[in-house]
From Swiss-Prot:
Side of membrane Cytoplasmic, spans: 1, 66-124
Annotated family: Belongs to the membrane magnesium transporter (TC 1.A.67) family.
Protein known as: Membrane magnesium transporter 2
Subcellular location: Golgi apparatus membrane; Early endosome membrane
UniProt GO BP: magnesium ion transport
Provenance organism: Rattus norvegicus (Rat)
Known role: Mediates Mg(2+) transport.
Amino acid sequence: MVAWLWKVLVGVGLSALAHAAFSAAQHRSHTRLAEMKYEPLPTDIVLQTLLAFALTCYGVVHTAGDFRDRDATSELKNVTFDTLRNRPSFYVFQHSGSSLLQPSDTTRSSNLNVPSSDDIRLKF
């Protein structure tokens, strides 16, 4: 079928779902105002909801297009071993562990005679 027809089918299904929800809310409001005991939803609202849901799902499945294969070998052909497990979202540049690697004040006070790397300048 034509692609736009599936989108129209989704639209019709969603509007039918909205209408069924409105009908259910209106039925509940009516039973409250009439001070009736709890009554289940009428059969036509339940059937409309189920039919609209099925129609919407059917349209969405066809609108989504072709599914990709689960076999990832075609995508992994051009990937090197170094980039295979590369996850940039796990990169941490400033973490609290760097403070553990710095020397404490006691070791720094004992090495006061040794010039630090900031004091040494290269002359060319």
